[in-house]
Amino acid sequence: MRLEQGDFSRETRFGDDPVSVARGFVAAGATGFHVVDLDGARSGEPRQLATVRAIASAVGDRAYVESGGGLRSPEAIAAAFAAGASRVVLGTAVLQDPSFARQAVETHGAARVTVALDVRDGQAVGEGWRERAPGREVSGAIEILAGMGVKTFEVTAIDRDGLRGGPDLRLLRSVLGTGRSVIASGGVASVDDVLALRDIGCVGAILGRALYEGDLLLADVVRALER
């Protein structure tokens, strides 16, 4: 399922069998899966760990699974790893309490903890994208969280998400300018978009709607990156 611009009232369902979808993407060359528990993002606690477990089991060592949504306690993070996630993605909890990021990094290692910065009008927002975190401009949030040991940030331009209008390269360049590792999300709709993200220095990109609707073929992306 995908949302447009983080709006839960503008959701599109692409199927009822995420495990089958994951197997298909692995066959096409996927090496990682970004699994967001939208129910968990709204409720504040994981609701789809069984799905994470099923996907991780299905793809085995052919691809990693990173899990986000509702991971707002040490117990929730531990449960995500126990379900088979290789990495966790933290959002609202670390915007509200940056020390939570430090605790996660110290417990699990920086390589297994990514922080999602969902950006609207230059502000990092939380609570399933429904609220603005006071005083959390993107640059300020990165500075604080980097001080907590976070090394990788997943940056989503909410106004681009699910609309296939191309990534917000200006936003991404500004984050890359901090010297942190950046995974881009939002608006990625073509092979050229992926190559542009690689060329500005992003370490990864999250592909969604364009893949599900067939406008972008994963095999084409893999071939382009291997050239």
Enumerate the predicted regions with their spans:
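Conserved anion-binding
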Residues: 1-11, 78-81, 85-161
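Conserved beta-strand positions in the central sheet of alpha/beta enzyme cores
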Residues: 34-37, 66, 89-90, 114, ...
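Active-site-adjacent loop and "lid" segments of alpha/beta metabolic enzymes
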Residues: 4, 10, 121-135, 163-165, ...
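Active-site-adjacent beta->alpha loops and helix N-cap segments on the catalytic face
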Residues: 40-57, 71-78, 92-114, 160-176, ...
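N-terminal beta-alpha supersecondary unit
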Residues: 1-46
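Catalytic cores of alpha/beta
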Residues: 59, 63-88, 170-207
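Conserved, mostly hydrophobic/aromatic
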Residues: 25, 33, 80, 115, ...
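Short, acidic/polar
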Residues: 14-26, 73-78, 133-144, 194
